[in-house]
Amino acid sequence: VVPGYPANKPEQPVIRVSYNDAMEYCKILSQKTGLNITLPTEAQWEWACRGGSDEDFWFGNLNADFGKKDNLADVTTNKFAVSGVDPQPMSPESPWYKYYTFLPKAANVDDGSLVQVGGKKYEANPFGLYCMHGNVAEWTRSDYVPYPYKENPKKVSEYKVVRGGSYIERPKYSTAYSRKGFY
């Protein structure tokens, strides 16, 4: 019996890491390598994500088919409608199906992934980076303050900017410019 969906396989991205833990990991890597390693700023992250594009995604606009490009909410999320102990997709004929397929999604796309995956399942952007849109959200070291903000704002936020969206978010929340605040 599988106790749930896989989330910690070696090829999957690290999840459920606090901002402080991510920064501590960067500090350890810096000490081991002699390089100055840190999380990117919000601007650095967006530049890397775009891969030279000025569109919503590195591969096109909001209506672009992301199926081979990135892991976002799509028809595969219907498989979250499960029954039994071993999570098996619920049949669409089940009277309960409509109550378990409520997640907003891009109904015309199937990227083939239910949860977060190793990046190389999808195409890399022109800079060679995988899954910058969707899959898992990524910390930046920027404070979450309203736009436009100054280079060194006086008010510091306890929230940090995360970018990239996740496997369960619709495309409009995973664009190169979408941002959220977490602490």
Feature-to-residue mapping (PLM):
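Functional-site microenvironments in short loops/helix caps that host divalent-cation chemistry
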Residues: 2-180
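Histidine-anchored, small-residue-rich loop motif
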Residues: 183
